[in-house]
Amino acid sequence: MTQYQKKLSDNILSGKELIRARLEEVPIQPGVYRMLDIDKKIIYIGKAKNLKNRLKQYTGDLEGKNLTMISLVYYLEYSVTDSESSALLLEGQLIKKFKPTFNILLKDDKSFPYIKLRLDHEFPQLIKYRGKDLKEGKFFGPFASVKQVEVTLLELQKIFKLRSCSDPYFSSRKRPCLQYQINRCSAPCTGKISKEDYDELVNQVKTFLSGKNKSLQHLLAQKMQSFSEELNFEEAAKIRDRIKALSYIQLKAETTGFVKDTDLIAITELNGEYCIELYIYRAGQPCGNHPYFPEHTEDQNISEVLEAFIMQLYQDKIPAENILLSHSINNSKLFTKALKELHGINVKIEVLKKSGSTANLMQIALENARIALEQHLKNSAKNRYALEEVQKLFNLSALPNRIEVYDNSHIQGAFAIGAMVVAGREGFDKKEYRLFTIKGQLQNIGGGDDYAMLREVLTRRLSRLKNEPYRSPDFMII
C-alpha cells in the first residue's frame, strides 16, 4: 500500500467514525444532512426519509463517489423536516445555495423570460419580461430563451398591432412612427385608432394568450362578415389577414398534440456526460427549448441526474401541469407532492410512451440533446487544451478550474471602474463576470492610480470568499 493509499484509507475510517459517533443523537425522522470538509465547506447535501438509517449506510461498505467523499468529511450537520417531501425541497434549496462538490449541479439556471401584457397604461402593450413577480399584468410563457420571446413578440405585433414604444416616446408623438407605416402598430398615440377599438385588440390578445385561439378566430370571422355586409372591405381584409396568421399559429400548435401546459424533458448520455433538453409548451404553443449540462460525479446514473435536475429547475420556476420524461425517476409521487408544496400546483409526472401522437416529439428532443452534447464535448476538449497550456505556461501544480482576470478603467481619474472576467473548464463564464465601481476615489484614490484601484477591487473580491468559498479562484491574472 502506498503512502497515499494509506492516508486515504485512514481518512475514510476517520470519516466513518465521525458519522458513527453522531448516530446515537440522530433522529429517525425525515430531514436533510450536510457533510463538511476540514475548512467547514459543505461538500455534500442529502435528504432522507429516515436520517438515522440513511447516515448509517455511510458507515458500511462504500464505493466510487462515496468513498472519496467520506475521506474528506470532518463535520456533519443535519436538519429535521416534517415530511420527506419537505426534505426534498430543502435539499434542493441548499444545493442551489451552496453548490457542494459532490452534488449534481445545474449550472445554467437563469430565470425564464415571459411575454407580458402591460395593463397599467391607458393603451396596454406587449413586452419582454424576466422575473418572479407575475401578478401585475397578463403573462404568456415561460419561454426557453429570449430569442424565442423576440420571435413570438414580432409575430404578435404583426397580428394585433399593439404599440411597442416606451411611455415617454408614446406621449411625445405628434405623428405616427415607422411602426405604423410598416403596418405593425395601430398608432394610438396620434388617434389613428379609437380607445374602444384598441381595447378590443387588447381583449383579443388576452384571449389568444389564454390559449383560446379557435374561439378568437370564430369571433374575428363574425366581425369580418359584419364588415363585409357593411361594404367596409378594407377593415374586412385586415381581419381576414389576422385570421390567416392565427390559423397558421393554430396549425403549429396542433402538431404538438399538447392541450395542457407541458414541460418535456429528455436526457441523453455520452462518454459519462449528460445533456438534458427542456421543451416548453404553454396554451398549446411551443415556447422553445434549451439544453442543460449538469455537473455530476462519475457514478451518478441517469435517474439521479434527472431527479436532481427536476428539483433544482423548479426551485424558482413554475412547473407545467404535465411533466413528460424520457426516462423514469425513482419516486415520481414524492416529486409531485414536493412541487405541490412549493408552488401550490397539481403536477403530473410521467414517462412519455414510445408510441402515440407525441412520441415523435420526444424522439426529436432526444436527438437534439445528443447533438448538443456532442458539441458540448467538443467545446470542452478545446477549453481543456487551453487550460493545459495555461498550466504549462505558468507552471501551475494542477489544472485550474477557475481563472479570474482583472483590469480597471477610468477617464483621467474619474468614473473609475474595475472588471473581473472568469474562465474555467466550460470556457468563459459570463454569469460570473463582475463590475466594481471604485469607491476609494472618494477617499483620495483618484488621479488615475491604477494600483490603488486594483487594491480596492481585489480586497473587495477576496473578502467575499468567506461567504462564497466555492468561488475561490485557482489562478488570478492582473
Region spans (language model):
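Conserved catalytic/ligand-binding micro-motifs in nucleotide and anionic cofactor chemistry
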Residues: 2-478
